[in-house]
């Protein structure tokens, strides 16, 4: 299985990007992983929230293969503790899917088309985080999940 993380817009903060790079490298020891950045939409000032979500949704859906399993990072999604998330990953690996795709949406969330395509939604917290920080948190939790599955000492139970 491959895991892909799709995100809208580049990471501007160099320190944050350095941490993302560290955890991405660690994660790639366990599984094939790809972080793909979808460029920000130009001229968003001229678009309504709905129009921006629709345009971002089209860009997201164009990055998917027909067999991909799409999971949205969404404030209304299911929350897991780290062990529960590792079990969630294991369940997907056991299902025989080729690629599990996590998506961090734009500032207004996802279009209806993206919600309809998704097979699940997860939430990292009830708190709000910057979308750039969420990238780091997701990659770190993926790494943590695999260390839990391998009974490695990174996670303290």
Residue ranges and their predicted role:
Residues 1-27:
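N-terminal beta1-alpha1 ligand-phosphate binding loop
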Residues 2, 97-102:
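Loop/turn-to-beta-strand initiation segments
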Residues 5, 71, 105, 138:
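Conserved RecA-like P-loop NTPase ATPase core
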Residues 6, 34-36:
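General small-molecule cofactor/ligand-binding pocket signal
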Residues 11, 75-78, 106-108:
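Short glycine-rich anion-binding loops that position phosphate/pyrophosphate groups of nucleotides
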Residues 32, 39-98:
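S-adenosyl-L-methionine/SAH cofactor-binding core of RNA-modifying enzymes
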Residues 105-106, 117:
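Proline/glycine-rich low-complexity loops and linkers
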Residues 112-156:
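Structured adenosyl-cofactor binding patch, chiefly the S-adenosyl-L-methionine
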